[in-house]
Amino acid sequence: DGLDRLGKALQRFIKEDPTFRVSTDDETGETVIAGMGELHLDIYVERIRREFKVDVTVGAPKVSYREAPTRLASYDYKHKKQTGGSGQYAHIVGSLEPMPEDVEENFIFEDKVVGGRVPREYIPSVEKGFRFSMEKGPIAGFPIVGVKTVLSDGSYHDVDSSDMAFQICARSCFRETFLQTKPVLLEPIMKVEVEVPADFQGPVTGELNKRRGLIVSTETENEV
């Protein structure tokens, strides 16, 4: 069966190459493969066809952008829902801001709640809701990176508050607040070192500039 062979192929590639990733588009059901570039993925597609005898249909490659905040935004968000039975209530206050440049992590959650304004058992649910929201940004649906969130205050209801209520609250709050941080799209860049004969320096430089490459430095050594 073609699907079984495709699954085996993808599992083998994942084991062989940590930069090769596989996911499924929830809306279309398509299998999405990601890697270091178009050539990298072309090699794996050819292996699927040649080694595993699976005639796959491949769409046009897409650049894997990221979404990131550029300024601090404060939030004071209340989730309140009342139905026939018990309702839902959660209230969180805090801020969302860009990650400091010297920090390499993509997400930091700081709990600054004092006095039990948000019970300790609900705080992990707030963090979980924020983390879930990082998977798909509101600008173009790309993952979000470089976010520091702070939870400083809030409130709860003795009956209607729950882990789920605080998680839902955090998800909705994150999406709304992130849009206030003037978010931007980031595109992937790669650092490369190019060695060419001195006679070709001009054409190669022109080609890099045409592709929006940023040349940091040039050196000439032994006519190279």
Residue ranges and their predicted role:
Residues 1-224:
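Accessory interaction regions appended to the cores of large information-processing enzymes
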